[in-house]
UniProtKB/Swiss-Prot annotation:
PROSITE patterns: SERPIN (PS00284). Major transport protein for glucocorticoids and progestins in the blood of almost all vertebrate species. GO terms for molecular function: serine-type endopeptidase inhibitor activity; steroid binding. The lineage of its organism: Eukaryota, Metazoa, Chordata, Craniata, Vertebrata. SMART domains: SERPIN. This is Corticosteroid-binding globulin. Pfam families: Serpin (PF00079). Keywords: Glycoprotein, Lipid-binding, Secreted, Steroid-binding, Transport. Produced and secreted by hepatocytes, but has also been identified in a number of glycocorticoid responsive cells (it is found in maternal lung, spleen, and ovary and fetal kidney). It is found in: Secreted. The keyword Amino-acid biosynthesis does not apply. Glycans are attached at N74, N154, N238, N308.
């Protein structure tokens, strides 16, 4: 498959959703970065898109239109049925068993148990999104939190626990979306080369982190347009990761320029170079209540008394109390045992470059086949 930088407008089945999904991804990423400028950010935009598209099956009227248009879909060009079929296919492709990839993603709706759920809605979210709506007693808030946490812990085999720490006050309808990802590098790092090194958080803060190292031929670019350098590292399977090192103090400049066009330009401009590469070993995670970010992006009706969710339940005015998203990304040395450590085509003519991710950096992970943005991350302090 072409890289995510290929022609993203192509309407082949797994890619029909890509333009809208990628545009939504960068909009959401920028909202969250601007709301927490000094914090790590880790989101899985494609799984948030999937969750909101699923929710639209229960919406009617303006609420439904606003949800789908807010996700970037032009409803005159793409019929609604095609959107849900596209996500159904995407969910199937991303969820196919790839032994080299540990990835668990999913959505669930928790609905106050006093409301009667429409069977047609349950059937639709099961069919298209392999999801379910669960009755919850929100009057007993500690127990409701426990139910949601246990549900997600079970679904992720314990990889994601305690999503619901510190959330309180009454609710009627909560949309939960989660993803855990740990890929296998096509060209692994040698664990014996990992050493504690300094990471410069800012001018006054330095922390020690385990720093992975490899010297190999990788796709590299010193961007002539934006103040950054980057490498593209492939996972076994369809995953590919861009590690972007902005010049000192230029993180915000690079984030502001992230777009489909930028990714396409990078993909065309990267060339194989021999690089001494240092990347922190870390587990990066983010937990978000997305109400503020979505409202700022024009997806606001669902949280207000204007909401129309008559396709979920016909009892009563119903609005969404919270949209929760939890993403966990593990970066470690491991590669496929069967992969020979050769890297890309050898270019012995070039002097080796050193690229050291020892200050705040960005990471973008795409699924190459579907052009889905699996993860967008900003790493201020590797954890």
């Amino acid at each position: 498959a072409d890289p995510p930088g290929g022609d993203i407008s192509t309407r082949s089945p797994p890619r029909g959703l890509a333009p809208a999904n990628v545009d939504f991804a960068f909009s959401l990423y920028r909202q969250l970065v601007s709301s927490a400028p000094d914090r790590n950010i880790c989101i899985s935009p494609v799984s948030v898109s999937m969750a909101l598209a699923m929710l639209s099956l229960g919406a009617s009227g303006h609420t439904r239109t606003q949800l789908l248009q807010g996700l970037g879909f032009n409803l005159t060009e793409m019929p609604e049925a095609e959107i849900h079929q596209g996500f159904q296919y995407l969910h199937h492709l991303l969820g196919e068993s790839d032994t080299s990839l540990e990835m668990t993603m999913g959505n669930a709706l928790f609905l106050d148990h006093s409301l009667e759920l429409l069977e047609s809605f349950s059937a639709d979210i099961r069919r298209y999104y392999e999801s379910e709506a669960l009755a919850t007693d929100f009057q007993d808030w500690p127990r409701a939190c426990r139910q949601i946490n246990e549900y997600i812990e079970n679904k992720t085999q314990g990889k994601i626990a305690d999503l619901f720490l510190g959330l309180e006050n009454p609710a009627i309808l909560i949309l939960v979306n989660y993803i855990f990802f740990k890929g296998t590098w096509a060209h692994p790092f040698d664990p014996q080369s990992t050493e504690e090194k300094s990471f410069y958080v800012d001018d006054t803060t330095t922390v020690m982190v385990p720093m992975m190292f490899q010297s190999s031929t990788v796709k590299y670019l010193h961007d002539p347009v934006l103040p950054c350098r980057l490498v593209q590292l492939d996972y076994v399977g369809n995953g590919t990761a861009f590690f972007i090192l902005p010049d000192k103090g230029k993180v915000d400049t690079v984030i502001a320029a992230l777009s489909r066009d930028t990714i396409q330009r990078w993909s065309k401009s990267l060339t194989y170079r021999l690089v001494h590469l240092y990347i922190p070993k870390a587990s990066i995670s983010g937990a978000y209540e997305l109400r503020g970010a979505l409202a700022a992006m024009g997806i606001a009706d669902l949280f207000t008394n204007q909401a129309n969710f008559s396709s979920i339940s016909q009892e009563g005015p119903l609005k969404v109390s919270k949209v929760l998203h939890k993403a966990v990304l593990q970066l470690d040395e491991h590669g496929g045992v069967e992969v020979a450590a050769t890297g890309g085509p050898l270019q012995l003519v070039s002097e080796p470059l050193t690229l050291n991710f020892n200050r705040p950096f960005l990471i973008l992970i795409f699924d190459d086949f579907t052009w889905s943005s699996l993860f967008l991350g900003k790493v201020v302090i590797p954890a």
